[in-house]
């Protein structure tokens, strides 16, 4: 019994030593991490903090691009546009939230790419009545098309940069959102309503995220 007691006692103290060793290693690694962070330039630390505190940092890719589409709709609403004239364009844009089969990203990029103003306005002659109508729509919109085109381009480019190996909460696309808000402010266009934005902020995912019905956030659904 004495030997058993000694074995138990030695095992107990051995466990304490091992635990202390691992605990010490963890503390050491944490201190190294803090030292590296401290030695980073102030600008780098500030940029990291800005990214981590960005309200869309943990929002999925679908949620982020949806916000840009909402900004686009706010611009159309601000300038008194007839949403039925923009319906095809908006439906194609919003389909990014619900597509999920096959090469859905490539399909979306192809369909939306054909609707970008640089493609529409340089196609001569328009190869279909639909494209001709969209071309006339863009032309009539005049200089205000600068803002609309920039928002569409931001949404398109954001999706272009998506990939299956996107890292957790990839911060690269956040600058598209920041640019969109800056442009909206410069043009005097209000940002999207809080209710719709709150819904998007619940779409949290480290990558592209699960499909959802984004069209219900659109003014198209409110006018139907």
Regions found by a protein language model. Name each.
Residues 188-224:
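Charge-dense, extended regions
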Residues 16-30:
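Single-pass alpha-helical transmembrane signal-anchor segments in small membrane proteins across taxa
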Residues 50, 57-192, 196-198:
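Structured binding/interaction patches within domain cores
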Residues 1-13:
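Short, strongly hydrophobic alpha-helical membrane anchors
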Residues 4, 17-19, 150:
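Compositionally biased, low-complexity segments enriched in small residues
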């Amino acid at each position: 019994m004495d030997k058993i007691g000694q074995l138990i006692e030695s095992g107990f103290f051995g466990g304490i030593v091992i635990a202390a060793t691992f605990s010490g290693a963890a503390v050491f690694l944490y201190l190294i991490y803090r030292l590296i962070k401290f030695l980073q330039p102030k600008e780098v630390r500030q940029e990291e903090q800005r990214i981590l505190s960005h309200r869309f940092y943990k929002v999925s890719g679908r949620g982020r691009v949806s916000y840009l589409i909402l900004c686009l709709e706010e611009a159309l609403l601000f300038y008194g546009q007839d949403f039925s004239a923009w319906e095809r364009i908006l439906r194609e844009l919003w389909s990014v939230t619900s597509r999920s089969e096959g090469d859905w990203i490539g399909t979306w990029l192809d369909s939306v790419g054909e609707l970008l103003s640089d493609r529409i306005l340089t196609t001569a002659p328009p190869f279909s009545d639909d494209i001709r109508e969209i071309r006339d729509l863009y032309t009539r919109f005049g200089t205000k098309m600068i803002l609309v085109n920039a928002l569409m381009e931001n949404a398109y480019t954001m999706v272009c940069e998506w990939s299956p190996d996107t890292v957790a909460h990839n911060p690269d696309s956040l600058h598209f959102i920041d640019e969109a808000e800056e442009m909206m402010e410069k043009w005097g266009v209000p940002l999207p309503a809080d209710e719709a934005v709150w819904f998007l902020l619940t779409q949290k995912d480290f990558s592209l995220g699960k499909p959802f019905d984004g069209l219900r956030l659109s003014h198209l659904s409110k006018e139907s």
